[in-house]
C-alpha cells in the first residue's frame, strides 16, 4: 500500500515509524510519503486566508493543496479529507480502506477549507463529534487502524478478526499467567480445555459487554438463534 499525506507538520507523524506500522514499512508492505503543502504555497508561502463574505478564523487556501496534490505520483487513489463534518470512521471503514493500493490524506488546520479543495476528494471522514486542532492525529489513527488489516502485516489474520468491532461485537475478556493474581483468578472455563464451552463463554461475554457498554451496536447486528438465547438471558439477569 502507498500512502501520501498532505500536511503542514510532517514531524507529527514520527509515531508511524514504530510498532506495527513501522514494521509494515520495514517489510516493504507499506510506503508512506509526507508532503508539506506550505512548500508549494504562493503568496509568500501563506497557506491560509480570510473567508469571502466575512466570518471568524482563516481558511486553508486551495492553491497549495492542488499544487501539492498534482505533484504526487498516483494512479487511482482514495483521497481522504479529514473533516469534523465528514462520515464517522469505524472498523468497517478501516476494512474497506485496507483493500486499497493508494491512499491520500489531506490534513487541514485553521477554521476550515476552501470548498474547492473537496473536488479532489473521494471521502470526507471524521473521527467523532469533536474538533481537533488539525487533521494529523485523525490521519494517524485511521492509518494505524487500516494498516494492521493489510494481509501479512499481523502474523495471524485471526488476531485482528477477534478484535472488538471486527465481529460486530465488543471483544470478550482475556487472561494470561498467573492463574491467581492478588486474589483475582482466571475463570475456570478457560482452564478446562473444553473448546466448545470456551467458545460459548467468549460469545456470551462479548454479547454481555456489548449490551452493557454499546447497546447501539446490537441494533445493526444480526443475531443467531444461539445469540438471541444468550442475550435474553443477559437481559433477564440484569433485571
UniProtKB/Swiss-Prot annotation:
Lineage top rank: taxon: Bacteria
Residues that coordinate or bind S-adenosyl-L-methionine: 108, 127-132
The answer, when asked if RNA-binding is one of the entry's keywords, is no
An example GO biological process term is: tRNA N1-guanine methylation
| Subcellular location field | Cytoplasm
| Enzyme kind, highest EC tier | transferase
Q: Which Gene3D superfamilies match?
A: 3.40.1280.10, tRNA(m1g37)methyltransferase, domain 2
A GO molecular-function term, please?
A: tRNA (guanine(37)-N1)-methyltransferase activity
Query: Keywords assigned by UniProt?
Result: Cytoplasm, Methyltransferase, S-adenosyl-L-methionine, Transferase, tRNA processing
Transferase among keywords: yes
List the EC numbers from the record. Answer: 2.1.1.228
In this record, what's one Pfam family?
A: tRNA_m1G_MT
Q: Which reaction does it catalyse?
A: guanosine(37) in tRNA + S-adenosyl-L-methionine = N(1)-methylguanosine(37) in tRNA + S-adenosyl-L-homocysteine + H(+)
Q: Which terms in the GO cellular component ontology are assigned?
A: cytosol
Q: What does this protein do?
A: Specifically methylates guanosine-37 in various tRNAs.
The entry assigns this protein to a family as follows: Belongs to the RNA methyltransferase TrmD family.
Q: How does it assemble?
A: Homodimer.
What is the designated name of this protein? Answer: tRNA (guanine-N(1)-)-methyltransferase
Species of provenance:
Streptococcus pneumoniae (strain P1031)
Gene name as annotated: trmD
Amino acid at each position: 500500500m502507498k500512502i501520501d499525506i498532505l500536511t503542514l507538520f510532517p514531524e507529527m507523524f514520527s509515531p508511524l515509524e514504530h510498532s506495527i506500522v513501522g514494521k509494515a514499512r520495514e517489510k516493504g508492505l507499506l510506503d508512506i510519503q509526507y508532503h508539506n503543502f506550505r512548500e508549494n504555497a504562493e503568496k509568500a508561502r501563506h497557506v491560509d486566508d480570510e473567508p469571502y463574505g466575512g466570518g471568524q478564523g482563516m481558511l486553508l487556501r486551495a492553491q497549495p493543496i492542488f499544487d501539492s496534490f498534482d505533484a504526487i505520483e498516483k494512479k487511482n487513489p482514495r483521497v481522504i479529507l479529514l473533516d469534523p463534518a465528514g462520515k464517522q470512521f469505524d472498523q468497517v471503514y478501516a476494512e474497506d480502506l485496507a483493500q486499497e493500493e493508494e491512499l491520500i490524506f489531506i490534513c487541514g488546520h485553521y477554521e476550515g477549507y476552501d470548498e474547492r479543495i473537496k473536488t479532489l476528494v473521494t471521502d470526507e471522514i471524521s473521527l467523532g463529534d469533536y474538533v481537533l486542532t488539525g487533521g494529523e492525529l485523525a490521519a494517524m489513527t485511521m492509518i494505524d487502524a487500516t494498516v494492521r488489516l493489510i494481509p501479512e502485516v499481523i502474523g495471524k489474520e485471526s488476531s485482528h478478526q477477534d478484535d472488538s468491532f471486527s465481529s460486530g461485537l465488543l471483544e470478550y475478556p482475556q487472561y494470561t499467567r498467573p492463574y491467581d493474581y492478588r486474589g483475582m483468578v482466571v475463570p475456570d472455563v478457560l482452564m478446562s480445555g473444553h473448546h466448545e464451552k470456551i467458545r460459548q463463554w467468549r460469545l456470551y461475554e462479548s454479547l454481555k459487554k456489548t449490551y452493557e457498554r454499546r447497546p447501539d451496536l446490537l441494533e445493526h447486528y444480526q443475531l443467531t438463534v444461539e445469540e438471541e438465547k444468550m442475550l435474553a438471558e443477559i437481559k433477564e439477569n440484569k433485571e
